[in-house]
Design a protein with these regions (language model features):
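Conserved N-terminal Rossmann-fold NAD(P) cofactor-binding segment
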Residues: 33-70, 84, 299-304
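Short glycine/serine/threonine-rich phosphate/pyrophosphate-binding segments
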Residues: 11-15, 82, 119-124
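Rossmann-like NAD(P)-binding element
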Residues: 54-111
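C-terminal substrate-binding/catalytic lobe of Rossmann-fold NAD(P)-dependent dehydrogenases
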Residues: 130-136, 145-306
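Short, well-ordered alpha-helices that flank and scaffold nucleotide-derived cofactor binding pockets
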Residues: 17-21, 43, 47, 101, ...
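NAD(P)+-binding Rossmann beta1-loop-alpha1 motif at the extreme N-terminus of oxidoreductases
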Residues: 1-41
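Glycine-/Pro-rich loop/turn segments that contact NAD(P) or position catalytic residues
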Residues: 87-104, 110-159
Length: 306
């Protein structure tokens, strides 16, 4: 599989290195506005070739050179000095729209995975700029937030993370929320599990911990990396290996939850054709209202910077 990565910063590097370590790409090409950084990241990953499952061809190139890629990950942007991902939209929307159009004009026929923040609005932008069907433009959405939730709950409940099936919906940002009615632990709905295995914790505190986790990491080391790198590569793996795996990603709302014309996160089946099926969960009235609030926040910001 030929993988293209736009943006060779911390996140772009993490995606490329993880893809090489997992053996899900045979050819990885970087692009960055700083060409020397793209070259350096490619060479650094190539230097570990002896430790990968198979040889991975590493290179760097222009937007036009991305035309032959099977999957392109857009990892552009920066959270330096920013405390709300939505602030990045005005900063990077024009550049993103321009390079997407250039890549598509060069003949790209694959799948876009949009990671750069604000990833919901950027996925919406890539969808419109590319002219691709929604199945071939996927936002990383709340996939990472959901793994953060699972990790938080597994520590509170003292169980393995794989035994928790959490759900974070809405925007990948300040208006995201935990859909508590859809959390399962060892195949039991959370409330039922807690009746049998009592544990005391504040749900509001859990939501805040999940929402603020990225900022705590950024404050400490300047960027997030490992979580998002593995999250995106789980999406790539599901597509490349046609796993039909359900992952919380951002997709175009076309009537689900009575929402329309915006990218938001919901469980989606990922396979060889990209986003193959979006799943509408049964939510409480409060959860539906919070999801609609996310829609309003994103649409307001899209309109603001039109």
């Amino acid at each position: 599989m030929k993988l293209g990565i736009i943006g060779a910063g911390a996140v772009g590097f993490a995606v490329g290195y993880t893809a090489a370590r997992m053996g899900i790409a045979s050819d990885i090409k970087y692009n960055d506005i700083i060409e020397e950084r793209a070259k350096a990241q490619a060479m650094d990953i190539e230097d570990a070739s002896s430790f990968y499952p198979h040889y991975v061809k590493m290179s760097w190139g222009s937007y036009k050179d991305m035309a032959d890629r099977d999957i392109i990950v857009t990892a552009t942007g920066s959270l330096d000095g920013v405390r709300d991902r939505l602030e990045e939209y005005e900063m990077f929307k024009d550049a993103t729209e321009a390079y997407v159009k250039e890549i598509v004009a060069a003949g790209f026929k694959g799948i876009f995975i949009v990671v750069g923040n604000p990833c919901d609005l950027m996925a919406d932008l890539v969808y419109r700029a590319s002219g691709f069907p929604k199945e071939r433009v996927i936002g990383s959405g709340t996939a990472l937030d959901t793994t953060r939730l699972n990790t938080t709950l597994c520590k509170l409940l003292e169980i393995d993370p794989s035994d928790v099936r959490g759900v974070v919906l809405g925007e990948h940002g300040e208006s995201q929320f935990v859909a508590w009615s859809n959390i399962f632990v060892n195949n039991l709905q959370l409330d039922e599990y807690l009746k049998q295995n009592p544990a005391s914790f504040s749900r509001d505190d859990v939501e805040n911990l999940v929402r603020e986790r990225a900022w705590r990491v950024i404050d400490g080391k300047g960027h997030t990396q490992c979580g998002i790198g593995n999250t995106v590569c789980s999406m790539i793996d599901a597509i490349v290996k046609d796993r039909k795996k359900v992952i919380l990603v951002a997709t175009l709302m076309e009537g689900m939850y009575d929402l329309n014309d915006i990218y938001l996160s919901t469980p989606c089946v990922l396979g060889k054709n990209g986003m193959e099926k979006a799943i509408e969960l049964k939510l409480t009235d409060e959860e539906l209202e919070r999801l609609k609030h996310s829609e309003k926040v994103l649409k307001a910001n899209r309109e603001k910077y039109k």
